[in-house]
Amino acid sequence: SFKGQQVHSSAFRTGVEWKGKNVVVVGSNNSAHDICADLWENGANVTMVQRSSTHIARSDTLMDLALGGLYSEAAVKNGVDTDKADLIFASLPYKALPALQIPVYEQMKERDADLYARLEKAGFLLDFGEDGSGLFMKYLRRGSGYYIDVGASELVADGRVKLKTGSIEHVEADGLVMADGTKLKADLIVWATGYGSMNGWIAKLVDQATADKVGKCWGLGSGTNKDPGPWEGELRNMWKPTQQPNLWMQGGNLHQNRHYSLLVALQLKARMEGVPTPVYALAAVHHKA
């Protein structure tokens, strides 16, 4: 019954045409923040709807505290080029990562305390992961629940982008009604509610039976939210043989695609050339979705 326009974040292109209009963006992670910033810069009246807590990491702080020793001009001067940095980063055991990451995010809390205080004052729901291990572990465990801040957090903190937390009750002709009865007028609703799973794409490209055979992709089996156990020891079904012969999964960030694509290519080439490629036994499938 909504009389305005609705789009998923994947279909949003620009805020140019929404100058002076009311726009509600449902979501509070990377896509939602980027879209809110674009809409605000183009003169829209923007409200972000946050339904659950989000981890915020300032880009500059993240690069300095977490990645500066590997990916920076200083690292290059120390002889650490991109290939070496990728190898070092990939060599860290996933089991050891949380203990290594927690102190980094404690430093981040101190350095950016003013931003976090202003966000919380604005009503923003913050978290640093279930165990305080921050962005990287959220990324590896679930691939969601965070925003790398390149400016939009300031817009939320000072109220230029309005914020409403809570669940949505329903959509009406001229906007959204929240569970607490608050009504948000909207000419446009952007649903920044995430993307489908890799399993979902397998089901679309092949069939559901194949998707179920491969099982859940991504995540470590940490037992945290959206990453059910048991512990896997490595990312589920990524860059290695799966339960479906000749179906390989490739994904992740730039570092992972640079580093692991070579290993996938070598495995494929070996099979084409008939070179034996003994590996550990195929991982058991514990989750279908």
Q: Language-model features: where?
A:
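Flavin (primarily FAD) cofactor-binding/catalytic cores of flavoenzymes
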Residues: S1-S52, S59, K95-A289
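A catalytic-pocket lid/entrance helix-loop region that shapes and gates access to the active site
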Residues: H55-L97
